[in-house]
Amino acid sequence: MILNGPGISYTEPDIGSEFVPPLPEHPREAIVKLCEHCTNRLLHRDELLGYEYWSFAEAATDEQAEVLCKMKMRRPYTLPEMVKLTGMPEAQIEKMLDDMSYTGLLEYNWENPERAKQWVLPMLVPGSAEFLNMRVSQLEEHPVYAKFFEQASKGPLSKATPMVPPGGAGIGMHVIPVEKAIDAASTSVPIEHIEHWLDKYDGKYAASTCSCRASRRVMGEGCADDPADWCIAVGDMADYVVETDRGHYVTRDEVYDILRQAEDNGFVHQITNIDGENKIFAICNCNVNVCYALRTSQLFNTPNLSRSAYVAKVEKDKCVACGRCVEVCPAGAAKLGQKLCSKKAGGQVPEYPRQELPDATKWDHTKWSPNYRNDNRIETHESGTAPCKTACPAHVAVQGYLKLAAQGRYDEALALIKRENPLPAICGRVCNRRCEDACTRGRVDAAVAIDEVKKFIAQRDLDAATRYVPPVVTPTRAGGFDQKIAIIGAGPAGLSCAFYLAEKGYKPVVFEKNERPGGMLTYGIPSFKLQKDVIEAEVEIIRLMGAEFRYGVEVGRDVTLDELRAQGFKAFYVAIGCQGGRLAGIPGEDAEDVTVAVDFLREVNSGKVDALLGRTIVVGGGNVAIDVARNACRLGSEHVEMFCLESEAQMPASEEERREAVEDGAHISCGWGPKEIHLDECGRVCGITFKRCTRVFDDEGRFASEYDESDLRRVDADRVVMSIGQSIVWGDLLAGSKVELGRGQGALADPQTYQTAEPDIFVGGDVYTGPSFAIDAIAAGHEAAVSIHRFVQPGSTLTIGRNQRRYTALDRDDVVLESYDNASREVAHVDREREKAAPFSEYIETFTEEQVRAETARCLGCGASIVDPNKCIGCGLCTTKCAFDAIHLDRDRPECSTMVKYEQKLPSLGKYALKRAIKIKFGKK
């Protein structure tokens, strides 16, 4: 053998190399021979690789290696046969065999007529490379085993994968569909059913550590799953697993519970595929982000190595592009596309590209997908999908919940919304409705009243009898995670983060310096827009999910981050928002009657202001300024006027907000900037002078205001409220930390993970983006929860295999809109009598059920899921997520259920390779 051979480059990141020392100048001869004997390469390679050498060197003594070299791979040996083979005394060889079995170099079974124990030198994968990784304590002591398993499950296949026929040729693992996805398949055969295998090995099951999860975690590419108990050994393998401290026996009901939880988490069922159609020894529940078996098909783009006999198919008439099937598809076969016809496609629904396959094509590394774990999580075709889902910062499945609402399935609609937005009742009142701005129906007449429908659905959360409390879906068999996580700030970002961490099985603790949750939702948004009991109701659900709230605690003042670390907190999500205001830097602004908008709104929302006398001048033109003006009007101020730099067309406040302010009695003057505040002899505000603003932005759209100082306007005032920006009040929160601050004192962080320069501190919401909308903060909180979950789980990557959140809207100018109903947009009733009687109560009523039915019928149904059959591996997970019965498995590839023994792999490969070569030569497909 060539020493220090370089191996093969697979264009994947080289992980675990730090665990592989250089080969010694004089390697142990017995170990070198063992490497030659056991490395089990499909294609000859004569290099001695470091991870192979050191794994065997750490696992075996020279004497053990010599015994192993005498054993033929996969041939069983009874104890008398081993005595004869080695010439060793029975007691001595039996102890050695048991020691090697405990390490993982050997396995054993009783598969003979006499039920005598027999030992087997297994192949590496599935086999000894896995066994070496299945006992966590052993793996942590010998991390080189992780690298060995990672490479042994990849390197030998690199050149053979294009020649693997349907069924897998006795190599590795085989996808077995979700049982209920094929219940009705009359053409199915027994080996395609999990129940068949559970019946075959009835009463002999053991749950064990997932070697793939454990291996990846040791090398820093874990998926944040708890590795324990996801793999189910069956038959004699169950005894082996238990007796060698790799697992524990489980009942059939416990097996069902593991399978159900795996499906809830989106894990793929696989069975071993090296013993033909009459034997398996394990059912695995695999996460594609770490699974080496699924990697064989995904990395090399050779699905024959994984797929079942089934292919997922979408009924487009039923599909509403909710994206649930797309999110769970391990192969990236399902992606969101469009249902509407396209002008570019000749008035037809567009055709979508299919993955090229090696069946009739020359195949080398240029055809591989080394970034498959991320690429498979891009959920939209480049040509786009429903604009509403794309435009929403949280990417809520708008089309899906509209359809559920249309069918009267309100609980399911609420559950679907909460997959991306845990505060739908709040957003139904205060969202800035970017989904409606993007709605294709707006090209016909008026956008669908999406937010009003959401508000109707989310009203269920305000009643304990109908509210939706999501179940915990956690990737651990322990019932949940015990890592302590602190969320600092109970605004929309913090609440969102708490919700999704609780849903994942954590018990996050939310620290809030105020006495009530909600942040600016509570202390900034007027109660006539958002009643505070709505906030309390949605927070109560998060509390019921397991989150703890500690009010009146300011982190940095009452308790420091280091003190929280000493209490056992492993990660922090800082989402304190922009709680301070900004002044204009003009004379007179330090007077008592000059305040900033956030302080004014906090006082009003805290109930500390009963009435406002005199004239109120508001400086600013955004939605917050509108809120100030409307509050002032409702508090009785005799004259309320807003002054802003922008023209009416440039005003940040929406047209609807401006209209409502005017209806409340506010006046709006555009094109003016503050110059000076005038005070009377007592030092109280008596007026303010403005100067004409001639330009707000430069040619590149950057703020660069210019003024005509000769064009002045003085107005009387009894108070001035500055609403020209907000600031972050850090206090001592970050004292001693490595968190870096940028423009506007906002925290700097990774744009995908929200991790700061202090690894255990994550940020989100306004402290990261600057002042924005609630839905932006909600989206950020969700992503932070993903990152924090990964961060606190040992050895996990924050980035690999996570949803890329890359959505593209279809081209609305390209869609064919020739036939549609002429129903006008429904409008929520405004109760003016209630508004007069209680000006600080909500007065815009919720849609009626009839209005919801009428409005949801206006949705054009832009999107649909598209399945690429060339990528589909037939796992059936998609069918478990669809609420519309729109996706099913069809048994289109019965040949993929051809299971052969490993010993028959070469004839299987050769036969298929010949057919493939002929196709390539003659250009057949």
Segments from the language model and where they lie:
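Ferredoxin-type iron-sulfur electron-transfer modules and their immediate structural context
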Residues: 33-35, 56-57, 196-199, 203-320, ...
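Short acidic, hydrophobic short linear motifs in intrinsically disordered regions
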Residues: 74-86
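Short amphipathic alpha-helical interaction segments
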Residues: 86-102
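A short, conserved structural fragment
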Residues: 101-112, 334-335, 887
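Short, amphipathic alpha-helical interaction segments positioned at domain boundaries
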Residues: 115-154
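Beta1-alpha1 glycine-rich phosphate/pyrophosphate-binding loop at the start
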Residues: 396-399, 405-406, 447-451, 487-555, ...
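Glycine-rich dinucleotide-binding loop and its adjacent helix/turn
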Residues: 457-478, 504, 537-557, 581-635, ...
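A Rossmann-like FAD-binding core segment of flavoenzymes
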Residues: 533-582, 595-612, 634-744
